[in-house]
Amino acid sequence: MKQKKCPFFLLVLGYFLIAFVIFANADQSMAGNKMLIITTSKYAKVLNKYINWKIKRGLDVELDILSAEKGAEIIQRKLQEKYDHGGLTYIVLVGDIDDVPSVMLAGYPSDPSYTLLEGNDLIGDALISRISVNTPAELENQLNKVLKYEKGDFENFDWIRHAVVASMTGFDGVDHAGKLETSLKSHPDYFDEVIKIMESDSNITKKIRDSIEKTGVNFIAHHGHGSTTAFASLHFSRENAANLKNFDTGFPIIHGAACSTGSFWIEDGDCLAEAFMKAGTVEKPAGAIAFLGGATSMDPGACIAAQKEVFMNYYFDEDVETIGELFYKGTLAAMKNLSEDRGERLFRRWHLFGDCSTPLWRKIPAKTSKNER
């Protein structure tokens, strides 16, 4: 007599088989030096110094100023050709969505979807980020920030050993922030100070601003409600971000577990991520060096699972060398424990602003006088 399988068992087995197929290569490495910059002709001249620096760092850089003007389908074709003929590791889109279009899905754009270049899974086959600007001057500001950061052109490197954990109290925020704080403090070889800012605190905006401008921080792990123009639970607006003055105190990496803060497609000015990236001036850039933000609504449980992976695991894995790979690894690790739908939303909606090839600063360099890494 054949024994009938329990329907629940079959359902669970099916879920794990689907997850295995879709996320089977989630531990793949992002080794390689091929970089493709996609932009328009109006930004080409401003990119010269930046490209020369990337080449000096050992990257094989190609500049494409034609594909963007022809639309997302042509961009996808270019990326596929590049990947198929010699590989591709870093994709940097330079310009706002009106300059360099994104893959448009149901109700939101998805730059990460450009990286699905091999197989039928949901594992990106290259790293991607966007330097979102509207003018050559805005681009020069952000590129000067990248150059200053990568070359280590700082008089003081204390900011490397400082971190911020900022969290709402709901959606498991108290427990999440506590675990991050405990984990980071358990690495005194990396951190002297871990600043925890909670939704229940007073003067939250000032605390965030002071941590960036006065203390100087390596990264901000943020978990809370968000909007297109602000962190909502721990209030910090695009106006607050645009007015930051932290040229001398390092540029933080921001991992934003929040809805809509990376909505670069809105029509009423900059989203919060863009404001953080555009802060300062050409002579004195400020704000963040990178910002991971949602293009639309996000799944808080999935986001904080990825954030734990980033700042409790991969940050301390020194084989993970770049900001892009750090966030990529964290997202994929979280996806392995999600259903297909939740994993796909997390992957397609989370956008990295900045340069995905920028190396991480983990330790204060032995020589602190304008080092070139």
Residue map of PLM features:
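Bacterial N-terminal signal peptides
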Residues: 11-21
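Cysteine-dependent hydrolase recognition
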Residues: 27-373
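Bacterial N-terminal signal peptides that target proteins for export
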Residues: 2-13
